[in-house]
Amino acid sequence: MSLNIFWFLPTHGDGKYLGTTEGARAVDHGYLSQIAQAADRLGFGGVLIPTGRSCEDSWLVAASLIPVTERLKFLVALRPGIISPTVAARQAATLDRLSNGRALFNLVTGGDPDELAGDGLHLNHQERYEASVEFTRIWRKVLEGEVVDYDGKHLQVKGAKLLYPPIQQPRPPLYFGGSSDAAQDLAAEQVELYLTWGEPPAAVAEKIAQVREKAAAQGREVRFGIRLHVIVRETNEEAWAAADKLISHLDDDTIARAQASLARFDSVGQQRMAALHGGKRDKLEVAPNLWAGVGLVRGGAGTALVGDGPTVAARVKEYADLGIDTFIFSGYPHLEESYRVAELLFPHLDVQRPEQPKSGGYVSPFGEMVANDILPKSVSQS
């Protein structure tokens, strides 16, 4: 099975280490353009753009990067309860047209009650999912060209319609991740691709089976994806040393404060991430080559695959054997790590690579000329 590999745009910040300004770098448009262009050239299928008050706006970032990329797709957030589903449908169609069919959408219900209250959304966990189901039903039908009347508990529209359709027909694909029963019910009814964070394979297999069964009960099939960090090096020893180095500036107080902040979330997925490490740094390898160190201070995706190219590829294939065809990777810092993943991991996987753009120059990778005259010796990529 060919795998669809995405990268990640760190609009919330980037650097060499977690939890410190040491080695940090400014994440401006120039830097984001570098990462997007690298992902575009290296063969990543798309980039996930995060959402929330700690991030730059994902829609504006995506729109700004359309002109500087050629094939890269942009996975941006839909926020039920924060924006009207009909307005979101118009925005989605416009982004799809402006990008010539390179827009993808990620339904994000939110998991931080404090942040949601600041955005004017005062619904509990169950109510948010009720509203998200209503939002998605309207959004999908409007994008597909229907004139929609809808009278729900949380949302009501009359005569909602779209005059300018998207490029992708009947509409751009919808992605979504969530671990609660309500989230799985939503995925089974509404989305094309269900995402999970990087839990151990047995836990992921259980979630996939549950969503697959619920989707089948509605006569639907759902694809599956996973969100993971990657620390890949030429040797396993180098990779584990890089993992240790990434959290080398973290102290116990920083970890404790981060975990206390994340504990207020009512997201089941976030609770499952936190349970993998328990806020302790002594047992971070929670499954073979699956390292939970990132989650000590980072919300959301908190695990990384660690190892050399063949080792990480073997772990990726374990997830693929469960039915996952889409992998959304990231690594710190994101520019350099995009190259490492492409150079050290891609050769060991069957990756769906977008067609390379035509160029007037010699773009085959061959290194630097020897003595200004001799082509370097070729090395097999297998």
Swiss-Prot record:
This chain's function reads: Catalyzes the desulfonation of aliphatic sulfonates.
User: Which reaction(s) are listed as its catalytic activity?
Assistant: an alkanesulfonate + FMNH2 + O2 = an aldehyde + FMN + sulfite + H2O + 2 H(+)
Q: Does the keyword Cell membrane apply?
A: no
Please state the Enzyme Commission number of this protein.
1.14.14.5
Give the family per the record: Belongs to the SsuD family.
| BP-aspect Gene Ontology terms | alkanesulfonate catabolic process
Q: Which InterPro entries match?
A: Alkanesulphonate_mOase_FMN-dep, Luciferase-like_dom, Luciferase-like_sf, SsuD_RutA_monooxygenase
Specify the superkingdom.
Answer: Bacteria
Q: What is this protein called?
A: Alkanesulfonate monooxygenase
Keywords (alphabetical) are: Flavoprotein, FMN, Monooxygenase, Oxidoreductase
Molecular functions (GO terms) = alkanesulfonate monooxygenase activity
Asked if the keyword Flavoprotein belongs to this entry, the reply reads: yes
